[in-house]
């Protein structure tokens, strides 16, 4: 797919969602189209369970194709590959859970728990958005004029590495984990004492899915300013690993916003064991205003 400018991306998303909404019957519109200014715009979760909206498995083939086009439009080539990986991990998890049932294979898009919602009217000049959300997956785009925002966005997986079945060894988001661990392993003893925020990994994500994250007065971890040149390059690569999931026009603008706000304020923290194979561990980036 050719790289789109921001106005081209906004236009492509607008055309796709208009096409999709035109194909919805009255009941589908009732379940899948909501006001932009309602609370649903900020209400989402990565946990399993039902969501408001249209389950992808209930869409017609034509409607499903448009929904998947939207999902691909929202991501870079690598981001789209990561999206498919997250879906494959979820499919593998369910395959293992359904071994006792008379089902040996599932369609990842039709059988897995993902829902589509449209927020607002893509025909109007007012802000509007669309979202595809399900277990461990959230992609949302908010369109204001010819500008596109790509948050909130979430990838996750459980298990992080598939341990049984035909997908044994498949890792979810391996580059994120490897970059964070590589950075941690380059730190000197005094640096590592700052970066190590806990000896055990938390049971869940610290910020959960809250629309406004309450951060401590002083960010935990080691700041960008306390890293040497090579470590800063690793830190930036780790940040870009997340930012560059988005389509380039959105990712590049996000990176400008981050660097303009100041990388010096960003901190890296690690919780849990560092050496691979010694237990669950993970890193995070933290900044009071981000």
List each model region and its residues.
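Acidic/His-rich structured neighborhood in mature extracellular/periplasmic domains
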Residues: 43-213, 217-220
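Conserved active-site beta-strand-loop modules that form the wall/rim of enzyme catalytic pockets
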Residues: 223
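N-terminal module-boundary/linker segments of secreted carbohydrate-active enzymes
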Residues: 2-23
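Long, His/Glu/Asp-enriched segments that create or flank divalent metal/ion-associated functional microenvironments
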Residues: 123-143, 266-290
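Short, hydrophobic/aromatic alpha-helical segments in well-folded domains
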Residues: 16, 179-183, 234, 238
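Extended intrinsically disordered, low-complexity coil regions enriched in Ser, Thr, Gly, Ala
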Residues: 11, 26-43, 47, 58-91, ...
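Accessory structured domains or lobes within enzymes
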Residues: 107-112, 206-214, 246, 250-279
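A short, ordered amphipathic alpha-helix with a cationic face
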Residues: 4-8, 41-42, 169-170
